[in-house]
Amino acid sequence: MSNEDYGYDYDYLFKIVLIGDSGVGKSNLLSRFTTDEFNIESKSTIGVEFATRTIEVENKKIKAQIWDTAGQERYRAITSAYYRGAVGALIVYDISKSSSYENCNHWLTELRENADDNVAVGLIGNKSDLAHLRAVPTDEAKNFAMENQMLFTETSALNSDNVDKAFRELIVAIFQMVSKHQVDLSGSGTNNMGSNGAPKGPTISLTPAPKEDKKKKSSNCC
């Protein structure tokens, strides 16, 4: 039985988290992918926000629920709740700031300590429009991604270069893992409904999908 039989407008719901240092452009990547918008005066995210977008993969409707949080030290207390239920992650750095790239190893370690073992991961070198200020060689980042079994893309949230590609590749990778049963979406129990009323099987164990796809903000994370 598909999720549409339960009244849902998607077949799969994937929680994806954006991680990386503050100021690398995570929020603008999120808004560019979900609403095709860019805020030139975007400030560091306070707390957590998420947005959704539905795409089609192999004739299945995939609803990506993408979470974004600030990278400052004081927000790391929300780590366990932020990563819980995530089946995909994008680690973002700024190609013009070497420190943001060097910290990717920390973010990868934190992800692996708090997320499922089979979470799909992509590395994003954002702000490719600042090529004249490049501080991180593409080949170096690409090799780091390969060594750690991550997808790799350089993007520009400003002019939208490769943003769609980066998210779609991750979503497809998650879908392929689900198809191979490398990710357990069924939860516990034997019936078709989770305790929160969301159908089991093809749906990630989250709360039922929100009726609105607009960003939700909260200064105090779950």
Swiss-Prot record:
<keyword id="KW-0072">Autophagy</keyword>
<dbReference type="GO" id="GO:0005768">
    <property type="term" value="C:endosome"/>
</dbReference>
<dbReference type="GO" id="GO:0055037">
    <property type="term" value="C:recycling endosome"/>
</dbReference>
<feature type="modified residue" description="N-acetylserine">
    <location>
        <position position="2"/>
    </location>
</feature>
<dbReference type="GO" id="GO:0016192">
    <property type="term" value="P:vesicle-mediated transport"/>
</dbReference>
<dbReference type="InterPro" id="IPR001806">
    <property type="entry name" value="Small_GTPase"/>
</dbReference>
<dbReference type="GO" id="GO:0005829">
    <property type="term" value="C:cytosol"/>
</dbReference>
<keyword id="KW-0333">Golgi apparatus</keyword>
<comment type="similarity">
    <text>Belongs to the small GTPase superfamily. Rab family.</text>
</comment>
<feature type="short sequence motif" description="Effector region">
    <location>
        <begin position="42"/>
        <end position="50"/>
    </location>
</feature>
<dbReference type="GO" id="GO:0006914">
    <property type="term" value="P:autophagy"/>
</dbReference>
<dbReference type="InterPro" id="IPR005225">
    <property type="entry name" value="Small_GTP-bd"/>
</dbReference>
<dbReference type="GO" id="GO:0005525">
    <property type="term" value="F:GTP binding"/>
</dbReference>
<feature type="region of interest" description="Disordered">
    <location>
        <begin position="186"/>
        <end position="222"/>
    </location>
</feature>
<protein>
    <recommendedName>
        <fullName>GTP-binding protein YPT32/YPT11</fullName>
    </recommendedName>
</protein>
<feature type="binding site">
    <location>
        <begin position="20"/>
        <end position="27"/>
    </location>
    <ligand>
        <name>GTP</name>
    </ligand>
</feature>
<keyword id="KW-0547">Nucleotide-binding</keyword>
<keyword id="KW-0007">Acetylation</keyword>
<feature type="binding site">
    <location>
        <begin position="126"/>
        <end position="129"/>
    </location>
    <ligand>
        <name>GTP</name>
    </ligand>
</feature>
<feature type="lipid moiety-binding region" description="S-geranylgeranyl cysteine">
    <location>
        <position position="221"/>
    </location>
</feature>
<dbReference type="GO" id="GO:0005741">
    <property type="term" value="C:mitochondrial outer membrane"/>
</dbReference>
<keyword id="KW-0813">Transport</keyword>
<dbReference type="Pfam" id="PF00071">
    <property type="entry name" value="Ras"/>
</dbReference>
<dbReference type="InterPro" id="IPR027417">
    <property type="entry name" value="P-loop_NTPase"/>
</dbReference>
<dbReference type="InterPro" id="IPR050209">
    <property type="entry name" value="Rab_GTPases_membrane_traffic"/>
</dbReference>
<feature type="lipid moiety-binding region" description="S-geranylgeranyl cysteine">
    <location>
        <position position="222"/>
    </location>
</feature>
<comment type="subunit">
    <text>Interacts with YIF1, YIP3, YIP4 and YIP5. Interacts with the GEF SEC2. Interacts with TRS130.</text>
</comment>
<keyword id="KW-0342">GTP-binding</keyword>
<comment type="function">
    <text>Required for protein transport through the secretory pathway. Probably involved in regulation of secretory vesicle formation at the trans-Golgi compartment. Mediates the proper polarized localization of SEC2, a GEF for SEC4, but does not alter the exchange activity of SEC2 on SEC4. Plays a role in autophagy.</text>
</comment>
<dbReference type="GO" id="GO:0015031">
    <property type="term" value="P:protein transport"/>
</dbReference>
<dbReference type="GO" id="GO:0000139">
    <property type="term" value="C:Golgi membrane"/>
</dbReference>
<keyword id="KW-0449">Lipoprotein</keyword>
<dbReference type="GO" id="GO:0005794">
    <property type="term" value="C:Golgi apparatus"/>
</dbReference>
<dbReference type="GO" id="GO:0003924">
    <property type="term" value="F:GTPase activity"/>
</dbReference>
<feature type="compositionally biased region" description="Low complexity">
    <location>
        <begin position="186"/>
        <end position="197"/>
    </location>
</feature>
<keyword id="KW-0653">Protein transport</keyword>
<keyword id="KW-0268">Exocytosis</keyword>
<dbReference type="GO" id="GO:0006887">
    <property type="term" value="P:exocytosis"/>
</dbReference>
<keyword id="KW-0472">Membrane</keyword>
<keyword id="KW-0636">Prenylation</keyword>
<dbReference type="GO" id="GO:0034498">
    <property type="term" value="P:early endosome to Golgi transport"/>
</dbReference>
<dbReference type="GO" id="GO:0005935">
    <property type="term" value="C:cellular bud neck"/>
</dbReference>
